[in-house]
């Protein structure tokens, strides 16, 4: 019996024990993120975005955040984590109308669309913080993100590089989830 990709993803999410879900992909972990409870772990990349902002003392509370991307892996969970930090969040995607204008309204822009070089200078303004979550192999064979870094970096206050930005912190978050899960298991 062949399963469709979407059906296969659902099956995998349901088959994994939430106690062993370090990257927030099970329905139980997702529910905990959406409900704001501590029952599971948020997806590591979404948690990495929030951790980066906090590490660099970038205010989140009351800030306008635009998230480009609506996936279960990054777009939706990072939006909910930022809402929990009292940000005002707008979720957009590659087909959102007037996307550059919406992006320029943000204090913090999270680019997680899965399209290499989708966001350039036309979509940003001075004073913004940009978290580039994408990772792709460019036409030149080098890694690149969802932003056109060389265009965006001179305009904004701060931007995460690709490689060496969000992905690096994602690995650290995963390790912290593994340690926390081991501690939980040891205390049961």
Task: Say what each PLM segment does.
Residues 1-7, 11:
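Single conserved hydrophobic/aromatic residue that forms the stacking wall/gate
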Residues 2, 51-54, 176-183:
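Short glycine/serine- and small hydrophobic-enriched flexible loop segments
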Residues 2, 17, 57, 101, ...:
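Structural motif
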Residues 5, 72, 95-96, 135-137:
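Glycine-rich beta-alpha junction loops
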Residues 9-23, 27-30, 134-185:
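Rossmann-fold NAD(P)-binding glycine/threonine-rich loop
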Residues 31, 37-125, 129, 144-147:
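Glycine-rich phosphate/diphosphate-binding loop of Rossmann-like nucleotide-binding domains
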Residues 100, 185-188:
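Short, conserved aromatic-histidine micro-motifs
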